[in-house]
């Protein structure tokens, strides 16, 4: 029988691998020429040299090293916060799998491979599957941490 920490680590690794693999597979298709155009969403190829909305693009090649330090620092922190990691292994697997996939793009392609362009009614930033998974992972983590944790505390009281 796996200990809780080992089980959480296994869940983290599985989710990390699924998100990372899915994101890289989609990006491979985009890099091989897959395109789509519609009135609402286009699939186009863009190399994002910055982070969200191309922020910090002035850091150029140094950004990928800064991101590696941030990812490693956060992972070390989580390994020290076993309860937090145990309770949110799925969300952290999503965020780390997506984040590492985007950092890999910086090393391999010189920028993050972005491709989803939403333009119905207004122009929105071009993004990718990994960006969505980071948003979903953080969103679920916040919901569970603030809303569901409060319900648990009320039950105990």
Curated annotation (Swiss-Prot):
<dbReference type="GO" id="GO:0006508">
    <property type="term" value="P:proteolysis"/>
</dbReference>
<dbReference type="GO" id="GO:0005886">
    <property type="term" value="C:plasma membrane"/>
</dbReference>
<keyword id="KW-1133">Transmembrane helix</keyword>
<dbReference type="GO" id="GO:0004190">
    <property type="term" value="F:aspartic-type endopeptidase activity"/>
</dbReference>
<keyword id="KW-0378">Hydrolase</keyword>
<keyword id="KW-0472">Membrane</keyword>
<keyword id="KW-0997">Cell inner membrane</keyword>
<keyword id="KW-1003">Cell membrane</keyword>
<dbReference type="InterPro" id="IPR001872">
    <property type="entry name" value="Peptidase_A8"/>
</dbReference>
<feature type="active site">
    <location>
        <position position="114"/>
    </location>
</feature>
<comment type="pathway">
    <text>Protein modification; lipoprotein biosynthesis (signal peptide cleavage).</text>
</comment>
<keyword id="KW-0645">Protease</keyword>
<protein>
    <recommendedName>
        <fullName>Lipoprotein signal peptidase</fullName>
        <ecNumber>3.4.23.36</ecNumber>
    </recommendedName>
</protein>
<feature type="transmembrane region" description="Helical">
    <location>
        <begin position="10"/>
        <end position="30"/>
    </location>
</feature>
<comment type="similarity">
    <text>Belongs to the peptidase A8 family.</text>
</comment>
<feature type="transmembrane region" description="Helical">
    <location>
        <begin position="58"/>
        <end position="78"/>
    </location>
</feature>
<feature type="transmembrane region" description="Helical">
    <location>
        <begin position="122"/>
        <end position="142"/>
    </location>
</feature>
<dbReference type="Pfam" id="PF01252">
    <property type="entry name" value="Peptidase_A8"/>
</dbReference>
<feature type="transmembrane region" description="Helical">
    <location>
        <begin position="84"/>
        <end position="104"/>
    </location>
</feature>
<feature type="active site">
    <location>
        <position position="131"/>
    </location>
</feature>
<keyword id="KW-0812">Transmembrane</keyword>
<comment type="function">
    <text>This protein specifically catalyzes the removal of signal peptides from prolipoproteins.</text>
</comment>
<keyword id="KW-0064">Aspartyl protease</keyword>
